[in-house]
Amino acid sequence: MALSFVISGCIGTGGIGPKGDLLPADSLATDQAIQRAALSAHWPNQQWWRVYNDPQLNRWIELAILGSPSLAMAAARVRDARAMAGVAESAESLQVQGTASLARHEWPSDQFYGPGALADSHTWDNNASLGLSYALDLWGRERSASEQALDLAHMSAAEQRQAQLELQENVVRAYIQFSLNFARLEIAQATLAQQQQMLELAQRRLKGGLGTHFEVSQAEAPLPEIHRQIDELEEAIALGRNQLAALAGKGPGDGATLQRPALALNTELTLPSALPAQLLGQRPDVVASQWRVAAQARGLDVAHANFYPNVDLVASLGYMATGGGMLEFLTGSKFSYKAGPALTLPIFDGGRLRAELGRASAGYDLAVAHYNQTLVTALQSVSDQLIRRASLDKQQVYAAESVASARKTYDIAMIAYQRGLTDYLNVLNAQTLLFRQQQVQQQVEAARLSAYAGLVVALGGGLSAGNDLPAAFVETGKKVDH
């Protein structure tokens, strides 16, 4: 054994090791958007989309969670990772294998074999044995490999939660766009009805000798464009049904049952008081990055352990016999066994082990950099959504004022036209302005609804990891041992 240590010293790590450092969450400065946001002690609810108060949306998100092929793939990856963890863990246990064979040997009587005692006779060549092996794992290689596989299983579970959150967000955003298209269609249809009334009025004025053919032509001119916009919006609504059906893993026929949404957001989302430190355990993508770092750290341990001798305890016992009756090999005199240690050690490998350690070190640094980037992006997304929400709240007020002003202008122009105090061009301009401002108001409201979803997702969507975090990340920013 002592010799093995001396020989294994021929291969050294050569100073190869990781260089990455984890970024402490509390080291990231929060901006005014986060500091000014109302704080509470609560994170988003796991069923956060229910604040929109739309039963149809609730039902379709439930359908998507149950039927989405993307979630099914994520769940399969989790099962695969857990199975791989079981395979790795089994290497730490006692391995027992049994073998047995029964063979009857007929001996020929030709000149090559005989004549002799066995000529034209038969014998039995039988054996049965148990083989046992156990890895002592003196340097923790098998334990580290098992822990690495388990960490990867945890990572897959976090990635599944991230896939679920992304699916929920995609359904909500598609549903909001679906609702916006209905609102825009309603505006376009109302505009069409108004324009047709204007055409009828122009025609009556012409018949009464008060109007001109030019006024009638002006009233007719916008109609084709309004019809085109209506057709375009009806197409968008049909495509929206297909999109929502596909997100739920359904066919287009199921999407045809979707009715006009009835979204109503009457709540404000406050920020948790422990941001950004507790963001580590709330966002699935951050949690997955943490488990990736932990897994790569265990991979470093495996690479280090490969430089040392591997010692296994092996044994075999059983019965064997050549000759005699079929069951004669089971007698006590035919019993045999052997037991002892088996040693394998690296001596010269052309730099393979150092290359593997270098690769493991690079993998750890890559995982650390990925985690740091994920954390930075997570905090940025929270700030972005808060800035967007504050801006949209102001835009909503301005948009409502613009619609009210445009409607008042249109009403005044219409009354003046009916009384012959102005020409039709002023009415048409006022109507166009009202139509445009109504569209802007609907777009701002849809953006507000989406901004709420964006902020919830930025905070992790209520899919808390709980205690499912690497131990080294319990203390924020602590470097994973490796």
Where are the language model's segments positioned?
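Outer-membrane beta-barrel architecture
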Residues: 86, 131-133, 302, 342, ...
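Short flexible linkers and secondary-structure junctions
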Residues: 11-170, 311, 315, 347-357
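Sec/SRP-type N-terminal targeting helices
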Residues: 72-73, 89, 136-164, 214, ...
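A short glycine-centered flexible hinge/capping loop motif at secondary-structure junctions
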Residues: 206-210, 417-421, 458-462
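Membrane-embedded beta-strand positions in outer-membrane beta-barrel channels/transporters
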Residues: 61, 127-131, 175, 220, ...
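Flexible, surface-exposed loop regions and adjacent strand-edge segments
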Residues: 114-119, 262, 329-333
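Terminal intrinsically disordered/low-complexity segments used for targeting and assembly
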Residues: 1-66, 126, 150, 234-281, ...
